[in-house]
Amino acid sequence: MGKKDKRWVMQRKNDFYYKLAKQNHYRSRASYKLLQLNEKFEIIYEGDNVVDLGCAPGGWLQASYDLVGEDGFVIGVDLQKVKPLREENIVAIQGDMTKKETINKIIDLMPSKADVVICDASPNISGVWEVDHSRSIELSLMALIATTHLLRKNGNFVVKVFQGSLFDQYVQLLTKYFKKVQTTKPKASRSVSAEVYVIGKKFLGKKFDKNTDFPIIKLIEDNEFLDRYIEETHEKKEGNETSDNDEDNNKNGLMIKKIKELRGKRSKL
């Protein structure tokens, strides 16, 4: 383990919410983000049916159970297999929330339509700001699309989004589907994190319309941010060609290659 990794492990172990989660047997410090969000915005109530999109490792499942109690029901889905929880009214399934068969399976397992849909999922991090933001927006859009099939009218929605150039447009998009939309960063979020939580209250019952909401999707599909990053990186590389810093030039070249590979792998919505 390198020095950087050791430092990260020590910082994590000394983190207040990490230690608190351990003490209270939560699987993740993120449990406190949901509890704080709920305290401020009153999203989840006792007896609610809750769907958790991207639920691994299960911290939000546990927090949701604490909020809904024995009369509620919580179901989570994730690409990874999630270790089962002991409570009978918490179910975790393995699946892709973007697939119709996964949505249908969730619907079949639920006693009724969801009162609340939550999503604390993060994309695979590349280390390139605009790439990660673009991926986060894609993931948040997928969560919204799934939510329009799972959530009852007047239900609530919570989703994590990374800050960036498309953030405001995503928030604006949610106003078409929810009567009230708010944004916040709970105390349990690390100050260095780019994450912001968007809360949609009172779902209007509309299905996602790709034709109506095409502008934000087109911006992602056109890879506008990746194009701009590559262009800027090329300019920096050309500016460094007269210097002796070959290491920086090599890093820039590798980053451009990495972004192009990422672009090729990205799936369309």
Swiss-Prot record:
Source domain of life: Archaea
Catalytic class of the enzyme: transferase
Gene name linked to the record: rlmE
Alphabetical list of PANTHER family matching this protein: PRE-RRNA 2'-O-RIBOSE RNA METHYLTRANSFERASE FTSJ3, RIBOSOMAL RNA METHYLTRANSFERASE
Similarity annotation: Belongs to the class I-like SAM-binding methyltransferase superfamily. RNA methyltransferase RlmE family.
Binding positions (S-adenosyl-L-methionine): G58, W60, D78, D96, D120
Keywords: Cytoplasm, Methyltransferase, rRNA processing, S-adenosyl-L-methionine, Transferase
Listed EC numbers: 2.1.1.166
InterPro entries recorded: RNA_methyltr_RlmE (IPR050082), RNA_MeTrfase_FtsJ_dom (IPR002877), rRNA-MeTfrase_E (IPR015507), SAM-dependent_MTases_sf (IPR029063)
Protein name as catalogued: Ribosomal RNA large subunit methyltransferase E
Catalytic activity as recorded in UniProt: uridine(2552) in 23S rRNA + S-adenosyl-L-methionine = 2'-O-methyluridine(2552) in 23S rRNA + S-adenosyl-L-homocysteine + H(+)
Active site per database record: K160
Region (Disordered): 234-269
Entry's localization field: Cytoplasm
